[in-house]
Amino acid sequence: MLTRALGTQGLTVSALGLGCMGMSEFYGHRDDAESTATLLHAVDRGITLFDTADIYGPHLNEVLVGKALAGIRNRVVLATKFGILRDPANPSVRGVCGRPDYVRSACEASLKRLGFETIDLYYQHRVDPEVPIEDTVGAMAGLVKAGKVRFLGLSEVSPATLRRACAVHPISAVQSEYSLWTRDPEDGLLQTCRELGVGFVPYSPLGRGFLTGQIRRFEDFEPGDYRRNSPRFQGENFQKNLDLVARIEDMAAARGCTPSQLGPRAATSSPSPAPSAATAWTRTWAPSTTCSAPANSRS
């Protein structure tokens, strides 16, 4: 497995990571035994970067990932996140919080659920518009000083906010949705990451699983799957995106791989102006198979 250096502080991870959100909710039924087997299989195939968050489950995902990786802690880089709040009585109701006291308490809670002494990469999941980023990152920097966190990251951040954050403490990674159908980071964020020496971690490089080519009908989404309520998968949008998948399937076939393998490669080897490691999760993804470019073409 190829590796990538994220940031300039010494964080090195596998070029492909495993995003664990879908193991606990959002994408239909959960199967903890299957998820645990997937986590261990990923390690065996050379993946070192594993991504979770306190709200996934909520909280269940950190427990699952922590238990699965406990015996091989020294072989993995564990990333988790704080900052999105969910109402336990109504999980669809959400808010954000970046207050310094919350940063510290959220970290302690995540460490307890994971069963780890240190979080390798700690992201602010979403920026709190009511709290200056300097205050939030200042509290995160305190966690580094205390030995509870090794490296800092931000998720879905603007270039301007990233600059302010880096002035407080080095940011090793920025995470944002980026795939063959989501190109927003190309509008300034990738360039800012390169300028500041910040690594870039694309999430959902498989387009919420849609770019795998395994979804053909709206009915393919299980009851309770959040994609049933997403505008991307409604009405004529569904068919337009199916048309895009057909083109991606042709591209993958020309390169001797599957759409599931093409997506992460595209997210990390497009003209990305920053070191990148993609995180993805799907039951059909086979990360051990490489995807090669056909003769006389550019990958």
PLM region spans:
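Alpha-helix N-cap and loop-to-helix initiation/capping positions
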Residues: 30-34, 60, 64, 94-102, ...
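A short acidic, helix-capping loop that chelates divalent metal ions and anchors anionic groups
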Residues: 22-27, 85-93, 280
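N-terminal binding-site loop/beta-alpha segment at the start of enzyme catalytic domains
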Residues: 1-77
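Short, acidic/polar
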Residues: 30-42, 98-114, 158-164
